[in-house]
Amino acid sequence: HLRNHGFLQTGGTGWSLSPLFDVNPTPEDIRPRYLNTAIDWEDTSASLDVLLSIAPECGIKTSETNDLLEPIARAVSQWRQVAESFGISKQEQDRMASAFEHADGYSAVLT
């Protein structure tokens, strides 16, 4: 919701808005992939197509979208390694996989 904002301290210079905050990955069998705060009037699905379609409305040129999405996709693509480093079992990782591994996920951006 709109009150979900986070700030990062930027050394001794102050604060900056966090690029990501309060993101809760949920497996698709628990909740379908849709946005509670819709970014498109007609389609509330959490999809790469919807994200790309509204980029110009956010002042982002189509040619810039991949440059912005690629670092995020690379980070998300390492989710299993990060989970393992925190001692999360393979069974638990498999349970969460549909929250990270889907057609509109990091593999679509990194291809």
PLM regions: where:
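Anionic ligand-binding catalytic core segments
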Residues: 1-111
